[in-house]
Amino acid sequence: MTVIMMKQLVFFIVITVIASCGQNEPLTNYEPKSPQEQALKSILLDFQDGVNTLDAKKIESLIHPKASLMTGRERKTLSKEEYVKILPKRLAGNPFIALGKPKMTVSGDKAEVKIYMTRGNYNGLVVYNMILEDNKWYIQGWKY
């Protein structure tokens, strides 16, 4: 192996490690950088707990009334009202989830949280759109 090839290999490994940072680190280990991030982390931990304890009411309380939520392999978008109707069945039919280390962008009363979610054999990026209303953060939508 030539020196140039060796340098390229090392560079590729370093980039891969940097790109995957946070994917396997749990949300519980995330250190928020602001009170807003702390509140968002709490909402996401509550969401994770609600899914894992099959608590549809807990999840419902985290979702904004005007939410638009992506669901299923077909990536159909549902209102909160539509989603809540299918939620108990979805919870019963899916494995537990684990949320990873997030990347949060907060701007006024809106926030975007990019986070890896593991569910069974699936590990993929989910983008949560959050909204602050009456001093409380809500999930306004998500996509994957």
Language-model features: where?
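Positively charged n-region of N-terminal signal peptides that target proteins for export
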Residues: 1-10
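Sec-dependent N-terminal signal peptides
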Residues: 9-18
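Short, low-complexity N-terminal intrinsically disordered segments enriched in polar/charged residues
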Residues: 21-53, 61
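Hydrophobic pocket/interface hotspot
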Residues: 47, 59, 67, 83, ...
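Short, well-ordered alpha-helical segments enriched in acidic and aromatic residues
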Residues: 53-66, 70
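Surface-exposed, charged secondary-structure patches
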Residues: 81-127
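Short beta-strand edge/turn micro-motifs at domain boundaries
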Residues: 123-144
